[in-house]
Amino acid sequence: MLHPETSPGRGHLLAVLLALLGTAWAEVWPPQLQEQAPMAGALNRKESFLLLSLHNRLRSWVQPPAADMRRLDWSDSLAQLAQARAALCGIPTPSLASGLWRTLQVGWNMQLLPAGLASFVEVVSLWFAEGQRYSHAAGECARNATCTHYTQLVWATSSQLGCGRHLCSAGQAAIEAFVCAYSPRGNWEVNGKTIVPYKKGAWCSLCTASVSGCFKAWDHAGGLCEVPRNPCRMSCQNHGRLNISTCHCHCPPGYTGRYCQVRCSLQCVHGRFREEECSCVCDIGYGGAQCATKVHFPFHTCDLRIDGDCFMVSSEADTYYRARMKCQRKGGVLAQIKSQKVQDILAFYLGRLETTNEVIDSDFETRNFWIGLTYKTAKDSFRWATGEHQAFTSFAFGQPDNHGFGNCVELQASAAFNWNNQRCKTRNRYICQFAQEHISRWGPGS
């Protein structure tokens, strides 16, 4: 089994050789160095795992401790690049001269050694040993020493790693090329001086929002910043599945709610069941929570008639879902505004209410009015209460602005009754709508 440690004698010999060879292998090995047939394949899975684990372990051992050190993940594409560069055996190529490698924003650690002198694990360990000659406080390497392997290996913002190895020949000698590629690259310079590779501080104390998790294996000295296993900071109940991209629970049949915490056994007598909300959409002429109540159309309570539809404006305030239920009990739905005409007429009418005594509830929240539009995280779009997609829109400037927290839509008085997404628990007045098809099928006195 390979270990990063080497015997004292062999380690000293390797250190001397590395110091002699340096990092710019094209300057050490002559142009007549010839490429040999590739080794039998690239690094195998076990070798890749060993190198990745070693890199992360060494990154957790830096002193002083790193506050922003990222955990490295293996990249097959970087491994292919590293394998291709190892196969060059140190020979300059037009692509290298043109800066192709630099445009890829890839950082490199490279070494040529006599074949069989060292394993890849030992080479990486010796790169890390360069850190003994590096001063983090001064941000520089000791005089006449090389530390660039070390600084790239522990560059905090590098998050992807891939390595390759190739056997070359130089006359009678067999030479082994070791290459590791890192992305994003490190060893950036300012005014000719390489900046420090990481910020010192308590482990994981300066992780960015996208990598706010803290990874620490059993053999790590400190933690490494990583994409959190559960960035949503939530879990789904009753065998629901969490989509960490949308922070939405996909519930099994029979359950609903944000966390699949609500058992839904509702039966719709005269209507269709909406599983995502555990509610019924009633057939024409029926109302109530289960669409079991026969209702009569109350012509005398229409506040507005627009293209045959009846709109009723409530005088009391309630939360969005209670308001929707109250409309349904009457055989209607929360208003669905599907054209500029309806929007303009409702805005004009509600604006007049502001100057009359028709607002009987003094609650400050009742200046706004619920309509039947909500944001559905599962569909990543706003939908009407009947499930239809929202085509027409009249959101106020800067709205909608808080998906996931303000999922219900109101007509906002301060924005000339254009739309605003709001917390569903807010108490607003509301507008019920009875479609023309409802009215024609019920008929007067039915």
Curated annotation (Swiss-Prot):
Recorded superkingdom: Eukaryota
Name of the encoding gene: CLEC18C
Entry GO CC: endoplasmic reticulum; endosome; extracellular space; Golgi apparatus
Every C-type lectin domain range: 306-433
Disulfide bond residue pairs: C236-C249, C251-C260, C327-C432, C408-C424
PANTHER family with a match to the protein in the record: CYSTEINE-RICH SECRETORY PROTEIN-RELATED
The keyword Glycoprotein belongs to this UniProt entry's keyword annotation: yes
Ranges where the EGF-like domain occurs: 228-261
Protein known as: C-type lectin domain family 18 member C
Tissue specificity field: Detected in peripheral blood cells.
Entries under Pfam families matching the protein: CAP (PF00188), Lectin_C (PF00059)
GO MF annotations in UniProt: polysaccharide binding
Gene3D superfamilies assigned: CAP, Laminin, Mannose-Binding Protein A, subunit A
UniProt keyword annotations, A-Z: Disulfide bond, EGF-like domain, Endoplasmic reticulum, Endosome, Glycoprotein, Golgi apparatus, Lectin, Secreted, Signal
InterPro entries: C-type_lectin-like (IPR001304), C-type_lectin-like/link_sf (IPR016186), C-type_lectin_CS (IPR018378), CAP_dom (IPR014044), CAP_sf (IPR035940), CRISP-related (IPR001283), CTDL_fold (IPR016187), EGF-like_dom (IPR000742)
Glycan attachment sites: N144
Alphabetized CDD domains for the sequence: CAP_euk, CLECT, EGF_CA
The SCP domain, residue ranges: 52-182
Subcellular location: Secreted; Endoplasmic reticulum; Golgi apparatus; Endosome
Signal sequence annotation: 1-26
Major location category of this protein: secreted
Function, in words: Binds polysaccharidesin a Ca(2+)-independent manner with a preferentially binding to fucoidan, beta-glucans and galactans.
Keyword match Disulfide bond: yes
